[in-house]
Amino acid sequence: MGEQQQQVERQPDLPPGFRFHPTDEEIITFYLAPKVVDSRGFCVAAIGEVDLNKCEPWDLPGKAKMNGEKEWYFYCQKDRKYPTGMRTNRATEAGYWKATGKDKEIFRNHHMLIGMKKTLVFYKGRAPKGDKTNWVMHEYRLADASPPPPPSSAEPPRQDDWAVCRIFHKSSGIKKPVPVAPHQVPAAANYQQQQQMAMASAGIIQVPMQMQMPSMSDQLQMLDDFSTTASLSLMAPPSYSTLPAGFPLQINSGAHPQQFVGNPSMYYHQQQQMDMAGGGFVVSEPSSLVVSPQDAADQNNNAADISSMACTMDAAIWKY
C-alpha cells in the first residue's frame, strides 16, 4: 500500500496528451536556476533527484517521475574527483560517462549567456578500453562558475554543483540502401564497354590503326617486275570482240526504252589494235588526220542519230 501511494505521488497530475519536453533555455531558466537558489525548498513534479555515480543508465528510467517517456530528467550534484579540483567523478560500478564534443552555450533572447550543455556517452568497463553504448546524457549547468571553495569551508554547495541531466537511449537503426534502377544499355554497346574495361584493367592501351600507303620507290619496284608484254596487255583497252555484229545498246527513258544499234566498223580499229598488242607488237596511236571515206560516213550517221535522240530526252533520265 505504501509503495502504491509513493508511485501515485511521483506521477505529476498532467492532462492526457501533455508531455514534458522543455527547451534548453527553459531548463536553465525555470528548473535549474531556482534549484540553485533554494535547493531544499524548490521541488518539481517532473524532475527527481538521483546520484548518477550509484546508478547505471538502464536503471534510471525506473527512478524517473515521468513514466512512458523516451527521455528522463534528474537533478544531480557533481561529485568532485578532488576536493580542490574542477574534474568530476563520473564512474559507476559497470562503467563510466565520457564527455564528447564541445560544450554548447545557451543564451536567453539570443544574446545573454545563461548556461552550458555538455554531452556525455556511457561506456561499459574501465577507461580507456570501455565499450561504447547508446546511452547519452545532456548535462545542463549555469554559466557563472566560480572556483571551488577550500575543503574546510562550511559554505553551502555552490551553484555549479547542481545540474539537470537529461538521459535517453539513442536508437541505432540500420539505414536500408536505396535501390537504384539498372541503366539500360544495348547488348552491343555493353559488350564493347566490357571489352574496353577489361583491356583497361589489364593495362592494354588501344591505338587506332592507320593504313600505310606504299612509297614511290615501292610502286616503281612493282612496275619493274612486270614484263613489257604483260604491261601492254594490262594497258590495252577492253575487248569488244565478244559483242555480236549490230549489238544493241539500250537506253532507258522512263516507260519507253530505246535501243541504239552501233556499227561494227566503229570497233574495227580498236579490235585491230588489241590483236596486235596481244601478239607483242607495239601499236602506235591512230592518226586523227587520216580518215577513210567509209568511216567518215558511219561517224556522221551515228552522230546524227545521237543528236536527234538527245534533243527529245532529258539528260536526268540517262541510266547506265
Swiss-Prot record:
Forms homodimers. Forms heterodimers with NAC26. This is NAC domain-containing protein 20. PROSITE patterns: NAC. GO terms for cellular component: endoplasmic reticulum; nucleus. Residues 14-170 form the NAC domain. One of its GO terms (biological process) is positive regulation of DNA-templated transcription. SUPFAM superfamilies: NAC domain. The keyword Transcription regulation applies. Residues 114-176 bind DNA. Pfam families: NAM (PF02365).
